[in-house]
């Protein structure tokens, strides 16, 4: 198979030494007793990393305890991290396959090459090109620190339920870039000189809330401050915006060299741009990224994979597995800023994207226009409402390849119904960052026998190949790219 982005061969692009490795760890496809190698646990003498269940007397500093929660694998070498992740993903797939086979009465997979008792072909994990400081987006909370200061900016330890919540500064975490930590530190400086209290619990009052920092590979930095207006007048509210603006333009915060500063007033835990518009206090309204030969526009509210270099590996993998051609319609569900579909647009007859966040759809349309892509269209709204009508409008007999990249909550069951029941979809690529819960249910309903009671009338899909892609070094998380056909 000739790759869309590479020379002919099966997923060959990661066969190189990750940073700091003395020799190549992963080859092409699993051969031999690979599981025995990757299933090796921590080396002798190394303590296993368990997530702290409380914040009572524990060994280690606050910083170490936060690292154990946010980046549980930080004490392992990156090579060992990949072994742990691969073993975990394989166990998930083994359980999933067993359940699907039980539902079908017989094995539902075809005679593809085996990979250590899996019916599907499990490829080796693709390592992240960047191991430390890889996050391009970080959200910092505001609450009481270990010293009791309520104007501490960082990440949480403990739980509200147990009454032991504490906010710990995060500049030591391996996955956070220095720039993000710098902006968080200066936001803390600003809070501690502000006469207004932070909003720790909504009903107890307070104003200043979390900080989000977004950066691109060129070093441009967007900061977004969330603020609870409480009972402030419009004039008082305007004064606070001017004060924080002055701090980051001409005050101590100027050291952050922000490209843009946004302000969002919010009386809810999480507000979209539609619910409460982001207000640009100064700078550029967007940041831009270069990925897969595309210039991509990113709005404050738009989803973009948090590891840019890893995202390129992920999207290349998706593109390779789709097998699209000039007669294919590519259906990109939960498309975000449209990168997957747009990167494949030159190889397909048409790209159809669906995304809930309006800002992300506007970014996708801008990216298409800027890059001269004319065979794409993007729709705003819930996929379960848009997809059935969109599929009905397409010509019979035209092949459709679907790519789904849902949030951790998975796909709505009506989306699964639409995919199952539209016979022109023969190939489906499913990207999952957390294959359990709703995502597991999605896979089962894609592969189970026809079930009129659930309105699953079309032929079942068959899981053919799985490629793990590590976008989250130092954490247990890993993206899985699953190829289904029927």
Curated annotation (Swiss-Prot):
It catalyses: uridine(54) in tRNA + S-adenosyl-L-methionine = 5-methyluridine(54) in tRNA + S-adenosyl-L-homocysteine + H(+); a uridine in 12S rRNA + S-adenosyl-L-methionine = a 5-methyluridine in 12S rRNA + S-adenosyl-L-homocysteine + H(+). GO terms for molecular function: RNA binding; rRNA (uridine-C5-)-methyltransferase activity; tRNA (uracil(54)-C5)-methyltransferase activity, S-adenosyl methionine-dependent. Disulfide bonds: none annotated. The active site is at 433 (nucleophile), 479 (proton acceptor). It comes from the Eukaryota. It is an enzyme of class 2 (transferase). Its main location: mitochondrion. S-adenosyl-L-methionine binds at residues 305, 355, 405. It is found in: Mitochondrion matrix. Belongs to the class I-like SAM-binding methyltransferase superfamily. RNA M5U methyltransferase family. Mitochondrial S-adenosyl-L-methionine-dependent methyltransferase that catalyzes the formation of 5-methyl-uridine in tRNAs and 12S rRNA. Catalyzes the methylation of uridine at position 54 (m5U54) in all tRNAs. Specifically methylates the uridine in position 429 of 12S rRNA (m5U429). Does not affect RNA stability or mitochondrial translation. This is tRNA (uracil-5-)-methyltransferase homolog B. It comes from Pongo abelii. The gene is TRMT2B.
């Amino acid at each position: 198979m000739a790759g869309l982005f590479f020379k002919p061969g099966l997923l060959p692009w990661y066969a190189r030494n990750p940073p700091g490795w003395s020799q190549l760890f992963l080859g092409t496809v699993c051969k031999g007793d690979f599981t025995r190698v990757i299933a090796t646990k921590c080396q002798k003498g190394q303590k296993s990393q368990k997530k702290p269940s409380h914040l009572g007397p524990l060994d280690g500093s606050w910083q170490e305890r936060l690292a154990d929660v946010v980046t549980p694998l930080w004490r392992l070498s990156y090579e060992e991290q990949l072994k742990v992740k691969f073993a975990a993903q394989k166990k998930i797939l083994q359980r999933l396959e067993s359940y699907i086979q039980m539902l079908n009465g017989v094995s539902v997979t075809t005679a593809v090459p085996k990979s250590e008792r899996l019916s599907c072909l499990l490829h080796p994990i693709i390592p992240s090109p960047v191991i430390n400081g890889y996050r391009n987006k970080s959200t910092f909370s505001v609450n009481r620190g270990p010293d009791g200061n309520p104007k501490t900016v960082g990440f949480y330890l403990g739980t509200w339920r147990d009454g032991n919540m504490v906010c710990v500064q995060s500049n030591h975490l391996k996955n956070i870039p220095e720039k993000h930590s710098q902006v968080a530190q200066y936001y803390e400086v600003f809070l501690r000189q502000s006469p207004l209290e932070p909003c720790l619990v909504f009903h107890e009052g307070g104003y200043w809330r979390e900080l989000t920092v977004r950066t691109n590979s060129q070093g441009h930095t967007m900061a977004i401050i969330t603020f609870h207006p409480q009972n402030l007048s419009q004039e008082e509210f305007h004064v606070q915006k001017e004060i924080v603006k002055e701090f980051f333009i001409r005050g101590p915060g100027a050291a952050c060299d922000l490209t843009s500063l946004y302000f969002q007033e919010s009386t809810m835990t999480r507000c979209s741009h539609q619910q409460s518009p982001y207000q640009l206090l100064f700078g550029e309204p967007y940041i831009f990224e270069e990925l897969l030969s595309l210039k991509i526009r990113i709005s404050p509210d738009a989803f973009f994979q948090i590891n840019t270099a890893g995202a390129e590996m992920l999207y290349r993998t998706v593109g390779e597995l789709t097998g699209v051609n000039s007669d294919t319609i590519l259906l990109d569900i939960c498309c975000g800023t449209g990168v997957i579909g747009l990167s494949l647009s030159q190889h397909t007859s048409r790209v159809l994207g669906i995304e809930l966040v309006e800002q992300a759809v506007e970014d996708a349309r801008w990216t298409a226009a800027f890059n001269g892509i004319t065979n794409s269209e993007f729709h705003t709204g819930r996929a379960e409402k848009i997809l059935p009508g969109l599929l009905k409008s397409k010509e019979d007999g035209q092949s459709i390849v679907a790519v789904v990249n849902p949030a951790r909550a998975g796909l709505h069951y009506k989306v699964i119904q639409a995919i199952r029941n539209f016979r022109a979809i023969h190939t489906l690529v499913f990207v999952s960052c957390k294959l359990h819960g709703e995502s597991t249910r999605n896979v089962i309903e894609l592969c189970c026998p026809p079930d009129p009671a659930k309105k699953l009338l079309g032929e079942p899909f068959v899981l053919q190949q799985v490629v793990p892609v590590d976008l989250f070094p130092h954490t247990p998380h890993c993206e899985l790219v699953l190829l289904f056909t029927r």
